[in-house]
Amino acid sequence: MNEDTVIIFEKDGLYNINSKNKANGLDLLSNIKNNTIATAFFDPQYRGVLDKLKYGNEGKGRCIARTELTQMDENTIITFIKELNRVIKPSGHLFLWIDKFHLCSGFTNWLKDTNLNIVDMITWNKGKIGMGYRTRRKSEYLIILQKSPVKAKGCWTLHNIPDVWDEKVEKVHPHSKPIELQRQLILATTKEGEYVLDPASGGYSVLEATLQAKDRVFIGSDISFG
């Protein structure tokens, strides 16, 4: 962290930067000052898809690890997003991981009473086939949100990121995410010394991506992992 890095915490000493923190993400967010975060990532553990699709294999086989994670209902997700809206800087970005169920059924109500605007989306091709009653799941979706005022110039500095991203990942967590994609997005939307936030860190891929981006500062937590 360089000398110009902004102090973002209301109370210092509760959380460590550039490392794992085992803590409730809402507690972490409540200790962060308004308009201090350049870029945030949010990957909720969706209860909705398990309730609606009812594959019948909850707690069985490869689904055990996923279902053992703390689930988030819609009200919890909305609370997180409102807090993220509060701490993100004007024209800063929130990268929201979303599954096909919520992409198709709708998620814009989560953004009500915020200053967050949908500006783009990336499809992550995971390179392997998952579950599905009809088509088999092979991708996830990253909704790109920008806090008002919306602008690209000066706020998005890389122009080599395609809207379909191929990257296989090592399964170190039920919600493992592509480190290189996240690294590129961090480089595109932050300057040296700025903060990258992930309040539901899971396998801490955003931490790894931030460290690889260099000269950025990670702050994040997970309720189960730290």
Role assignments for model-derived ranges:
Residues M1-S221, F225:
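Core catalytic lobe of class I
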